[in-house]
């Protein structure tokens, strides 16, 4: 088994997938990853709709002006939602669950890509959240955060380059301009 660090460095967004379906046990593993994600006060405010139907994937791909067309080519899309009546931090809860699924996908050798829905619009300027809600009969109390598309990658991207990490965005103790040593270490 590889380390978690290696998994994180290898995970990249994939927008092009092969036609191969995802095995049912892999779908279950992806959803299990979402269900074990931590939530504020253990509220489990998230809910998910898993979509494999090709026609529905095509319709979901039209949820945004730009940046959602890849959903038509994925084998599985998971709509990630949060119950706004359960907690005011449903966005954070749902985001963690989506990220867990993406890391699980990488561990399974699958590709994934996040499609933001909340605060986005369709080509005809409808709120993307309402478009998805209407399409999938999602009740009003569930906010639609994103759709994560999964599939077998058409190609594997290069891992993140550790030397290119933006350590200057890290501040120790308080916010200040940090100096980066030649070895990539942040100097206080």
Cite the ranges covered by each PLM segment.
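Acidic, surface-exposed loops and disordered segments
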Residues: 1-188
């Amino acid at each position: 088994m590889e380390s978690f660090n290696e998994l994180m460095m290898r995970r990249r967004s994939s927008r092009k997938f092969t036609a191969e379906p995802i095995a049912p046990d892999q779908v279950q593993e992806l959803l299990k990853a979402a269900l074990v994600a931590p939530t504020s006060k253990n509220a489990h405010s998230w809910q998910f709709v898993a979509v494999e139907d090709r026609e529905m994937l095509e319709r979901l791909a039209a949820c945004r002006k730009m940046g959602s067309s890849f959903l038509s080519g994925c084998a599985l899309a998971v709509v990630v939602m949060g119950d706004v009546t359960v907690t005011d931090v449903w966005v954070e809860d749902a985001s963690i669950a989506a990220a867990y699924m993406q890391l699980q996908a990488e561990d399974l050798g699958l590709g994934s890509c996040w499609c933001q829905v909340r605060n986005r619009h369709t080509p005809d300027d409808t709120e993307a959240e309402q478009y998805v809600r209407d399409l999938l009969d999602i009740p009003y109390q569930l906010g639609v955060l994103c759709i994560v598309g999964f599939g077998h990658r058409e190609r594997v991207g290069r891992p993140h380059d550790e030397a290119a990490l933006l350590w200057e965005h890290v501040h120790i103790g308080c916010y200040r301009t940090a100096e980066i040593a030649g070895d990539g270490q942040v100097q206080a």
